[in-house]
Structure formats: C-alpha cells, structure tokens
C-alpha cells in the first residue's frame, strides 16, 4: 500500500507534538464507524497522549510482528483524541495497538482515503 499522502492537521489541545502526512482510516471491528487519522511514514514519530500526557516514541523494536515501519495514529472519538502506535501489515490492514484496562489489544481496519 502507498497511503502516505495528504497534509497536516491540528487537534487543538487534546494532542500536540505530531507532524507528518495523514489519511483517514475506517475501523472494521467493534469501533466500527469511528474516524482514525493516521500520521507518519517510515520515520519515528512522537506524540503526547491525552489524559496521562505520556510522551512516547514508536520504534521498530517496540512493535511486534510488523511488516512495515510503525507509525503513530490519532484516534478521534466524540471529539476526544488519543495517540497509539500503529503499523501496516502486508495485506494493507492497519493495526492499532491500544492499552486499555491493563492489557494491550489490537484493532484492525482498512484505508478510507485521503481527506
């Protein structure tokens, strides 16, 4: 897949410190219908997550079983943004690694085009 096109976007005070091209992405799981904005390329990207304000860096060693370099994504749900490490599988599916209730889980979806 060649998803890296588009421009930049601002999320106000919820998420800061994020730069790079972006596209829109649609989940195909229990988060069906939510909008996800993807950032990054094959470069390391950093971002500040809303809530605990944890600053983290996504590197090739920090995300398991990936076929493409990991990126950072911002998931926007009802006006609240959260930042998660992500990567693209060879099938073109995007995997979002999320940490909720003390456990990691993955959300998979498909590209939905450039905004």
Predicted regions and their residues:
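Extracellular jelly-roll beta-sandwich "head" domains, especially the C-terminal globular C1q domain
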Residues: 16-20, 43-57, 63-115
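Extracellular receptor-binding modules and their adjoining Ser/Thr/Gly/Asp/Asn-rich linkers
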Residues: 1-52, 112
